[in-house]
Amino acid sequence: MIQPQTLLNVADNSGARKLMCIRVIGAASNQRYARIGDVIVAVIKDAVPQMPLERSEVIRAVIVRTCKEFKCEDGIIIRYDDNAAVIIDQKGNPKGTRVFGAIAEELRELNFTKIVSLAPEVL
């Protein structure tokens, strides 16, 4: 569960390393926590030098991994080691060209198919 002020790792090669959530944009208008597949507004806290994304830039990201376990439709419970997100543009396309680490199958059902196709492993 991701809420405002939560620090997240970036799971792509867009140039950012760490994000801090500042707002949850989910299906519900006044959703308090973000889960896998929810879109958040975040600020970049740490970035790679000489890359297009810079520190203190406000961006949108989609949550791909959370430490809080979640139950799949088939009854399997999945929990990851870290909280991670992929930076997206206004249309929902990823800004990076690679995605690192495993991501959840639920992203395919939420129309983030481009992120799923870039991922090395889908659980």
Swiss-Prot record:
Entry-linked PROSITE patterns: RIBOSOMAL_L14
GO cellular-component term (any): chloroplast
Pfam families reported for this sequence: Ribosomal_L14 (PF00238)
Localisation: Plastid, Chloroplast
MF-aspect GO terms: large ribosomal subunit rRNA binding; structural constituent of ribosome
Alphabetic keyword roster: Chloroplast, Plastid, Ribonucleoprotein, Ribosomal protein, RNA-binding, rRNA-binding
Top-rank taxon: Eukaryota
GO BP terms, alphabetized: translation
Main location: plastid
Described purpose of this protein according to its UniProt entry: Binds to 23S rRNA.
Similarity comment text for this entry: Belongs to the universal ribosomal protein uL14 family.
Subunit structure: Part of the 50S ribosomal subunit.
The protein's name in its UniProt record: Large ribosomal subunit protein uL14c
Source species of the chain: Oryza sativa subsp. indica (Rice)
